[in-house]
């Protein structure tokens, strides 16, 4: 998807797929070149050509390329994960981030314990000031999680479960 490049005489991907004549005013042509047939097929399957046409008509022209890029990405993810789509990918990344922050905090704490440095002198979370500030408020052993437990591993596992939609 390259935007507003001069068109060749061939039809755009949308008109090819929909088996219609591509006109000079085709709203799909600048965004779905004839070589983007698979991309348009995915967008059409998930959103429908009529809905995409209406959406592109409502979006300012300078934002249409980004709109098409977003639709193509969302269609791709929705076809891979029909139930959760992008939300499932976001939840998975958030879970991974929490696991890595936890692992980093544990590793730094162990490193400090083995180095003989007093824990009050150095924070194991120097690179994560937001998390460090939160954990400094409450001792780790007394940390109450959102689900009411103190078991961080179980909590991280629960975060990894797909969200209820």
From Swiss-Prot:
LOB domain location is 10-111
Pfam families for the chain: LOB
Which InterPro entries does the record cross-reference, listed alphabetically?
A: LOB
The record's similarity note reads: Belongs to the LOB domain-containing protein family.
Q: What is this protein called?
A: LOB domain-containing protein 21
Q: Which organism is it from?
A: Arabidopsis thaliana (Mouse-ear cress)
Q: Which gene encodes it?
A: LBD21
């Amino acid at each position: 998807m390259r935007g507003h490049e001069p068109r060749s005489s061939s039809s755009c991907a949308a008109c090819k797929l929909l088996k219609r004549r591509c006109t000079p005013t085709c709203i799909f042509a600048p965004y779905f070149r004839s070589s983007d047939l698979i991309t348009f097929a995915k967008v059409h399957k998930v959103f429908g050509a009529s809905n995409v046409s209406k959406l592109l008509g409502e979006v300012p022209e300078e934002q249409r390329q980004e709109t098409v890029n977003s639709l193509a990405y969302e269609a791709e993810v929705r076809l891979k994960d029909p139930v959760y789509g992008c939300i499932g990918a976001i939840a998975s990344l958030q879970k991974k981030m929490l696991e890595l922050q936890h692992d980093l905090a544990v590793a730094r704490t162990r490193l400090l314990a083995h180095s003989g440095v007093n824990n009050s002198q150095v924070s194991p979370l120097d690179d994560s000031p937001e998390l460090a500030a939160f954990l400094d408020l409450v001792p780790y052993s007394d940390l109450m999680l959102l689900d009411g437990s103190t078991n961080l591993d179980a909590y991280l596992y629960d975060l990894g479960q797909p969200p209820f939609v």
